From Swiss-Prot:
Signal peptide limits: none
Source domain of life: Bacteria
Transmembrane segments: 9-29
Topological region Periplasmic: 30-137
Function statement: Heme chaperone required for the biogenesis of c-type cytochromes. Transiently binds heme delivered by CcmC and transfers the heme to apo-cytochromes in a process facilitated by CcmF and CcmH.
Stated name of the protein: Cytochrome c-type biogenesis protein CcmE
Gene: ccmE
Subcellular localization: Cell inner membrane
Binding positions (heme): H120, Y124
Chain ranges on the Cytoplasmic side, renumbered to this chain: 1-8
Organism: Rickettsia bellii (strain OSU 85-389)
Pfam families attached to this UniProt entry: CcmE
Length: 137
């Protein structure tokens, strides 16, 4: 093998190995971020005090207003329930039987949320929007 071809081959091998190592490091670090939220039935698998997202349906008759900006409510995945405490402004779509994602920490079996995200279906229309009437109807 000629010296120039040998140097090119070594350079290609080094670049390939570097790329494999780089992708491996990125995937290893992103592993925890791939799951968007944890359902209440899997909450026992998460360590206490670690920030995470939990998601489920707001259980009917579970919303309790503690103060003007403090509430507690229960979410469920129809397997297990989880009580959530939240202080702040509620999303406009927050209501019973609605899907939500709460971001916060688990502490002594209670979830303390710092942010709530209300989920909606693919037919969502923001409040105060008018659906234009179709011609001829």
């Amino acid at each position: 093998m000629q010296k120039g071809a040998k140097n090119r081959l070594i350079t290609i091998i080094i670049c390939f190995c570097s790329a494999v190592i780089g992708v491996s490091i990125i995937l290893y670090n992103l592993e925890k971020s791939i799951v968007f939220f944890v359902p209440p039935s899997k909450i026992n698998e998460v360590e206490q005090g670690k920030e995470l997202r939990v998601g489920g349906l707001v259980k009917v008759d579970s919303i309790n207003k503690i103060a003007a900006d403090k509430i507690s409510f229960v979410i469920t995945d129809n397997i297990k329930d989880l009580e959530i405490f939240y202080q702040g402004v509620l999303p406009a779509l927050f209501r019973e039987n609605q899907g939500i994602i709460a971001i916060g920490r688990l502490s002594n079996g209670k979830f303390i949320a710092r942010e709530l995200l209300a989920k909606h279906d693919e037919n969502y229309r923001p409040p105060n929007t008018v659906i234009p009437a179709k011609a001829g109807i």
